[in-house]
Amino acid sequence: LICYSQMYNEIIKTCENGETTCYSKTWRDHRGTRLEKGCGCPPVKYDMIVKCCKTDRCGN
């Protein structure tokens, strides 16, 4: 599976160990709105939003 690994959809990462999900996670802190992308589908705290998907380059 190929997932984006940075805020801007320029850098991609090939997931390892049979990972079948990509994610895009957003939250706000003292620096403003933050965005993280990668492989997997991580658990999140109540003030975060995570979107998980299962196709190549789907975490826009």
Swiss-Prot record:
Disulfide bonds: C3-C22, C15-C39, C41-C52, C53-C58
Coiled coil: none
Annotated tissue distribution: Expressed by the venom gland.
Pfam families: Toxin_cobra-type
One Gene Ontology biological process: modulation of receptor activity in another organism
GO CC annotations, alphabetized: extracellular region
GO molecular-function term, one example from the UniProt record: acetylcholine receptor inhibitor activity
UniProt-listed PROSITE patterns: SNAKE_TOXIN
InterPro entries per the UniProt record, alphabetical: Snake_3FTx, Snake_toxin-like_sf, Snake_toxin_con_site, Toxin_cobra-type
Compartment(s): Secreted
Keyword line: Acetylcholine receptor inhibiting toxin, Disulfide bond, Ion channel impairing toxin, Neurotoxin, Postsynaptic neurotoxin, Secreted, Toxin
Similarity field: Belongs to the three-finger toxin family. Short-chain subfamily. Type I alpha-neurotoxin sub-subfamily.
Summary of the function given for this chain in its UniProt record: Produces peripheral paralysis by blocking neuromuscular transmission at the postsynaptic site. Binds to and inhibits the endogenous nicotinic acetylcholine receptors (nAChR) in human rhabdomyosarcoma TE 671 cell line with an IC(50) of 346 mM. This neurotoxin is lethal to mice by intraperitoneal injection and to zebrafish by injection at the back of the dorsolateral region.
Protein name: Three-finger toxin MS3
Organism: Micrurus surinamensis (Surinam coral snake)
